[in-house]
Amino acid sequence: DLEIVKLDWDSLVPAVQSGKVDCVIAGQSITSERQQMVDFTEPYYYASIITLVKSDGDYADAKSVADLKGVTCTSQQNTIWYDSCLPQIEDANILPAQESAPAMLVALESGKCDAVVTDMPTGMAACVAYPDFKLLDFSGTDGDFEVSDEDINIGISVQKGNTELLDALNSVLDKMTEDDYKEMMDEAISVQPLSE
């Protein structure tokens, strides 16, 4: 039987390590730091990094990271978005990290900041929930955030050494196409509430 458990972002890895959950499917990047604590499937998604701004804000016409110079910004704590991407913005006023994706979106909506950096699925869902947001996607251009594949490859985490579950998950993932992943992601974005 499948049981879905809602956890805070910082609880995901400990929940897998302790056996509270068998696996985590939550947009986790397969970083070397996380791989020291849990095992990962092959990547099932590559999440491009995007920026959200208000559609009527000062940065709505930005075409590159350079165009965000001086922006007041934030993102979710313990993510590549906050730790690596925000510091790439010249003269950025980086606010403290937010505890969750919903919290960073509220910071943007309330005017505490002019931009948040996140991944494409979160950004797409945010634009549904907040129609006054604009998604800026610099991926594939020279003006994009500099990130490695490790930073954006998304996998399912399992307890270290649980090869039986890891092999079973990889077996299913191996049969899926890029179109399958896109369809599932689009559906998940359409039904995922952006609330705490």
Enumerate the predicted regions with their spans.
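Proline/Glycine/Serine-rich low-complexity intrinsically disordered segments
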Residues: 1-196
